[in-house]
Amino acid sequence: MNNKRHSTNEQLSLDEINNTIKFDHRSSNKQKFLSFLGPGLLVAVGYMDPGNWITSMQGGAQYGYTLLFVILISSLSAMLLQSMTVRLGIATGMDLAQMTRHYLSRPIAIIFWIIAELAIIATDIAEVIGSAIALNLLFNIPLIVGALITVLDVFLLLFIMKYGFRKIEAIVGTLIFTVLFIFIFEVYISSPQLNAVLNGFIPHSEIITNNGILYIALGIIGATIMPHNLYLHSSIVQSRTYSRHNNEEKAQAIKFATIDSNIQLSIAFVVNCLLLVLGASLFFNSNADDLGGFYDLYHALKTEPVLGATMGAIMSTLFAVALLASGQNSTITGTLAGQIVMEGFLRLHIPNWLRRLITRSLAVIPVIVCLIIFKGNAAKIEQLLVFSQVFLSIALPFCLIPLQLATSNKDLMGPFYNKTWVNIISWTLIIILSILNVYLIVQTFQELQS
């Protein structure tokens, strides 16, 4: 990576929201914190999207509470990586897509753009599938119609954006807490053993020695750290009105944006733990192998003998509501991330509605095509979700490495560059994640072929 300076005529990242939300560095710490409360919510969505659900619940159903430790480590790793994107966005005034295009050679930057665009599409595919399945479960809407309905999210997003980015943050926050409270209720009803849950946060050697547990563990790790979140976060932290030329204000902005990020990622951590605990408390040592997808989970909750007919119906319906809320949340953030990647790499100057419609269509079209080819076969569509998660594993190093190189560059970051301990941990994480993701990809294709 060269040390070319950030061009002063660089287009602002997400210019319609950039520098629009008031942040007064002279106000109290409480006011500063409240000013920066919000971007982390949009990032947290990616850590509890529909792609994570099956992995977490399967992990609990098949191996009890053992994998809670893996969720903890994954969440702590995510906090570190997201804090690096916060520093990149605030210190440089660039998002990760702009930085990658600006500081890598053109041929390499183009390759990175293609991979980033495909990663956004893969992320969106999971959300479209999750939302379509939720609509089918709740209202018996055909999957193909449900997938088409998700296109309307684009226009809903455009409508809400007219009233300010704070409205987006509020809606996303409401949907997140809807999911959180649904799963708190469901876990409470399922009555897990507290001692067993707490024991799950202690590392167990079988996570490494048992191939089945290791495979699920890798799935949890791979589904937790999402490429689109790194692009998204580096952009939306710039929505606050801190001085772009005052390092003291930048330092305060980084501090409170990081606090916001860590709080919201802690909520995502709790949701993922609740999913695993729910799977363990209801299905461990029973019909765990039958929980292959959203439909399986829905019907398993509905017919679970421990719950009874009435509570089973309530639990399964709430599960579908939470799936819809999660899918809608993720489509909002995925669309924004797609806009950031398209603008950042290509400098496209097209109307917002068209840019977002293109981003959404690129995700919906593959789902529609597969629905037509497989004649609405739900199992095949859920398999498409698996493929989308595998591609995210492939794409992850292509955004982690530029992020690491940029944030460790003192000429680029100024006083906000990575400290030595951060570099050691982040490089270790990148290497481990890359190795684990290669293993996960191989294992997934072997599973699909068997």
UniProtKB/Swiss-Prot annotation:
GO terms for cellular component: plasma membrane. One of its GO terms (biological process) is iron ion transmembrane transport. Keywords: Cell membrane, Ion transport, Membrane, Symport, Transmembrane, Transmembrane helix, Transport. The chain crosses the membrane at residues 34-54, 61-81, 108-128, 141-161, 170-190, 212-232, 263-283, 305-325, 361-381, 383-403, 422-442. It comes from the Bacteria. InterPro entries: NRAMP_fam. The keyword Ion transport applies. The keyword Ion transport applies. It is found in: Cell membrane. H(+)-stimulated, divalent metal cation uptake system. Belongs to the NRAMP family. This is Divalent metal cation transporter MntH. It comes from Staphylococcus aureus (strain NCTC 8325 / PS 47). The lineage of its organism: Bacteria, Bacillati, Bacillota, Bacilli, Bacillales.
